Design a protein with these regions (language model features):
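Cysteine-nucleophile active-site neighborhood
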Residues: 83-157
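Intrinsically disordered, low-complexity regions enriched in glycine and serine
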Residues: 11-24
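Short acidic low-complexity segments
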Residues: 62-73
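Extreme N-terminal starter segment of soluble prokaryotic enzymes
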Residues: 34-38
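Short, surface-exposed beta-strand/loop micro-motifs that present aromatic residues
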Residues: 204-211
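Acyltransferase
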Residues: 218-242
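Short acidic/histidine-rich motifs immediately flanking catalytic phosphotransfer sites
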Residues: 72-80
Length: 242
């Protein structure tokens, strides 16, 4: 994506005759500026892409690797990204003792965003290597069973269909048809259908995002989804700043 330039909010003095001052930035941008968002580094995530996306929408990303660093960050929001194998993602969280930190954060309904493996890790179990997840939400992570003409992994652009109306994460996005970027062979099957924030079709419907309170997760990569993905990070930063 192209990182938008955010002009300085500072003003200068001066006499009359000059050009009129620029209009103030949108309130959501003002609210998200200087908001610290912790980003968990589990060793297998696209850390740079996520932090750059947060910077692009005016937030201050803070990379954390331990519970102490998370506490010390005084972050208003938490992002758990991940790419690769779920076993490695969950294993790294447990080794760093961040698994309890994530569960505790979510239990308090603090602003949270899981991305790709960061979404899959929240469920009870995955068919990928028979992995036990964090158990935040009841449900499983299952492998695509699709016609031979549909390649696995599901890779590339696909369109969303939002199932929860009025979700703060979807502000500024169309209810249906927004294109986002996926790379995955497994998808989440929540036990509670009301958890599904958005669906996508790939030989059949699957869960593309979940939402409950101020806790969200996406199977797709907002940081790779250009303007629409930045809107999701902008919405999350505004939610964290509220």
């Amino acid at each position: 994506f192209t990182t938008p330039q955010i002009s300085s909010l500072g003003g200068g003095g001066g006499g009359g005759g000059g050009p009129p001052p620029p209009p103030p930035p949108p309130r959501d941008l003002i609210s998200s500026l200087m908001t610290t968002i912790a980003v968990i580094d589990n060793g297998i995530c696209n850390l740079r892409s996520v932090t750059k996306a947060l910077e692009a929408v005016g937030a201050l990303p803070r990379v954390v690797r331990t519970p102490a660093e998370l506490t010390g960050s005084s972050a208003a929001g938490l992002v758990l990204p991940g790419v690769g194998a779920l076993r490695d993602c969950v294993g790294a969280l447990r080794t760093a003792r961040l698994d309890d930190s994530v569960r505790g954060w979510i239990a308090e309904d603090r602003p949270f965003l899981g991305v790709c493996l960061g979404m899959q890790a929240l469920f009870d179990h995955s068919e990928e290597g028979d992995v036990k997840g964090l158990g935040v939400f009841a449900g499983s992570v299952v492998r695509f069973q699709r016609p031979p003409e549909l390649k696995i992994p599901h890779m590339g652009w696909n369109t969303l269909r939002f199932r929860q109306s009025g979700s703060p994460l979807a502000a500024g996005l169309a209810p249906e048809g927004e294109a986002v970027y996926f790379v995955h062979s497994f998808y989440c099957a929540p036990a509670d259908p009301s958890l599904v924030l958005a669906e996508c079709d790939y030989g059949g419907a699957f869960t593309a995002a979940i939402g409950q309170g101020r806790v969200f997760a996406t199977q797709f990569h907002p940081e790779k989804s250009q303007a629409k993905g930045l809107q999701i990070y902008r919405n999350f930063a505004a939610l964290a700043a509220a």
